[in-house]
Amino acid sequence: VRVLICLGKENEKLRKAFDLDADEFFATGVSIVMHPENPHVPIIHMNIRYFESGNTWWFGGGIDLTPVYIVPEDASYFHQTLKSVCDQYDPSCYFKFKKWADDYFYLAHRKETRGIGGIFFDRLS
C-alpha cells in the first residue's frame, strides 16, 4: 500500500495541458499492488487519486485483477460487483470505465488485456 500526498508549483506545460488557472496544485492518492505467493489468489492493482488546482479538481483511479488460474465465476462476480457500484451513479459508466481499462491496460506485445480487466477512470469531477 502506498499513500501519496504532493503539493507543488505548476509549470506552463501542466497549466496548458489541463487548462488550469492557479500556480499551485495538490494531489493525493492511495495505491494497492498485491502479488500474493499463493497462485490461487489473483494479483490486484487498485489506485484512487485526487487532484486540485484553484477551482479545478478531479478524481481518477482504477482496479483490475490478474489471476494465475481464471475461475469464471470469480471473474463474473468481480465485474458484477464493479458494475453494481458504478450503477449507483450512472448505469452507463461501468461499460465506459471497463473499455477505458481494457484500452489503458492493453499489453500490445501480448495482444491482450491485463488479466480479467477491471475499470479505469480519470478527470471525474
Spans of features found by a protein language model:
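Gly/Pro-rich turn-and-neighbor structural signature
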Residues: 1-17
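Short helix/loop capping segments that flank catalytic or ligand/cofactor-binding pockets
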Residues: 12, 41-43, 71-74
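N-terminal accessory/cap region of cofactor-dependent oxidoreductases and related radical enzymes
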Residues: 12-19, 23, 27-29, 50-52
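Glycine-rich, often proline-containing surface loops adjacent to acidic residues and nearby aromatics
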Residues: 26-29, 57-66, 111-125
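Conserved phosphate/anionic-ligand binding catalytic regions in large, soluble enzymes, centered on
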Residues: 30-43
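Beta-strand elements of well-folded, non-transmembrane domains
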Residues: 36, 52, 67-69, 123-125
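Compact, glycine/acidic-enriched structural inserts
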Residues: 54-96
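A contiguous, surface-oriented mixed alpha/beta subdomain in the mid-to-C-terminal portion of proteins
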Residues: 90-125
